[in-house]
């Protein structure tokens, strides 16, 4: 196994035993990126000098000492571009570190570069980036998912040992599933949002994308914790997630299967893979019980009312006056605002701003926005009732595997449905984990989702860890080319 193929845990063992130096690790990874990234375009910015310099000063005794981490382009890193893959933020340099970056630095991590994304995190394919399209390492004719597609593609292609993404409606979990990675959306308030460029403030959450569940637990442990700069941050002790993975008794564990998530329209191979996952847990002694989340059918509509309403307010701050792109030819201030935003925002961002402004308008506020808030509470109540019968839920992460580039761009509704199984988790503010469970006959990764109650990340992490441990999961090396023959799972046969 080559150095860049290692998990964070394996890399840390070599670093601690001084079998490899942080400088060698960074140099090895930069070589891998130079070789591979022209094929998939996961990174939009690399700071070679800073990474190499940091590697020479790395403190191996720290939890992430010497480990390079990739960062999604909507998370502020002092002195680096933070353009959110948008033209309107061209030339903008972050004037401060976000809280998660401060925590990574204190843990000894080396910041490697910034990954591509859908503009302002609005999208499910990373096709909405103003910088260029990221491709799926398993088939470069396919999307990596979104909006954290660059982070997922980088980890899957072994261009990063781990990465940070953000998840507003599935933007960590869906690309993780499409690329064959582990993606964790923490409970809302577990991880500080300070320094994350806001899309929908009541739904956004930063989380890790990794090669293994063990690595996700370690990163969550590092980035979690109360932050006075984020008024939605909860003042709770941070569990030792990485130490709570082992020795979890499964004898009395009940895993709920929401019937609303196993509907017509799910790809047959996804359904088959999920059936095998359920069967595997049953063999481990887990009790499987069907549950109902009756308001699930309303989740997508509810999400796109609330998220776009918040986006229209949050993105009003970008006008080109203090920083970023600005129109050069205009007649007056109103004309300036219009032209700057028209030139700076992409079509999907404009669509969502228009929709959000519409649902907040005086004639429709009660009919749409207030009603959506009520449905959001109903969805949250559904999960609370379900968790009275079980400790976690198991669902598909996505109803299908990665789709072809350009396949859904002309039909926004079809694109929005890519997140149909992930959106409700954000509306409820709870935690969820996407784990690879196989590959299709075309060689495309399939993922399943474990959903846990608020503040119970250790439950789903332990359940995911047991799955990977008992199936012998080893992060595979993708072909980085066109269509390949697939079939068979990584750990379980299909």
UniProtKB/Swiss-Prot annotation:
Reactions catalysed, as given in the entry: L-glutamyl-tRNA(Gln) + L-glutamine + ATP + H2O = L-glutaminyl-tRNA(Gln) + L-glutamate + ADP + phosphate + H(+)
Q: Is Protein biosynthesis one of the keywords?
A: yes
Q: Name one GO molecular function term.
A: ATP binding
Q: What start and end residues bound the annotated signal peptide?
A: none
Keywords, ordered alphabetically: ATP-binding, Ligase, Nucleotide-binding, Protein biosynthesis
What the entry lists under PROSITE patterns is as follows: AMIDASES
Instruction: Specify the domain of life of the species encoding this protein.
Output: Bacteria
Q: What is its EC number?
A: 6.3.5.7
> What's this chain's function?
Allows the formation of correctly charged Gln-tRNA(Gln) through the transamidation of misacylated Glu-tRNA(Gln) in organisms which lack glutaminyl-tRNA synthetase. The reaction takes place in the presence of glutamine and ATP through an activated gamma-phospho-Glu-tRNA(Gln).
What family is this? Belongs to the amidase family. GatA subfamily.
Descriptive protein name: Glutamyl-tRNA(Gln) amidotransferase subunit A
Which organism's genome codes for this protein?
Methylacidiphilum infernorum (isolate V4)
Traced from the root, the source organism's taxonomic lineage reads: Bacteria, Pseudomonadati, Verrucomicrobiota, Methylacidiphilae, Methylacidiphilales
Gene name of the record: gatA
